[in-house]
Amino acid sequence: MEDIIFFLLGYQVLGKTMMAQRIPTILPELTLEESLEVTKIHSIVGMLNETSPIIKLRPFRTPHYTITASSLIGGGRNPKPGEISLAHNGVLYLDEFPEYNKNTIEALRTPMEDGKVTISRLNSCITYPSDFMLVASMNPCPCGYFGSDIECKCSKNSRKKYLEKISGPLLDRID
């Protein structure tokens, strides 16, 4: 999917989530090879539908901002795929982007560059694909109303601090 990142910035109830949810519907259909890759990954974590065991639609994953780095990247005693691998050949949507733990967000950098993630444990090392489109959204300030018809209660300093939660190296990758 290449290293494609979209960033949606806007006040509350603007429709950022709805726009993100529509992205998989305008992407090309999965090829047979992509479909089998996605199906294998979902099979490992027991996420296949019994009535339709082959996944034919591009994944759309939207983890909560409280997710840990290991749940996002993958891990465990017997390493399992994380959200980035479950989003392989699809979309990973991170809503309320600045609310994610900084270490969790920074953990995305290498897998995004490589299109894969390697999880090492004492007795094993496994690599899962992680070629996904990252779509992140955020409000322009902590209260979410800056720029809208509703009065923003945030100070200029709190808005600046809120926007600075996103690192420069990650912003460099955003379209």
Where are these regions (language model features)?
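Walker A/P-loop
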Residues: 3-50, 114
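Conserved nucleotide-binding/hydrolysis micro-motifs of P-loop NTPases
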Residues: 13-15, 26-28, 42, 98-99, ...
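Conserved alpha-helical scaffold flanking the Walker A/P-loop in AAA+ ATPase domains
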Residues: 53-59, 66-92, 125
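AAA+/SF3 P-loop NTPase mechanochemical coupling elements
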Residues: 60-61, 80, 85-89, 119-140, ...
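Conserved D-loop-proximal element of ABC-family nucleotide-binding domains
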Residues: 101-103
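Conserved catalytic/switch belt of AAA+ P-loop NTPases
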Residues: 106-126
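A short helix-turn-beta junction within AAA+ P-loop NTPase domains corresponding to the substrate/partner-engaging
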Residues: 150-175
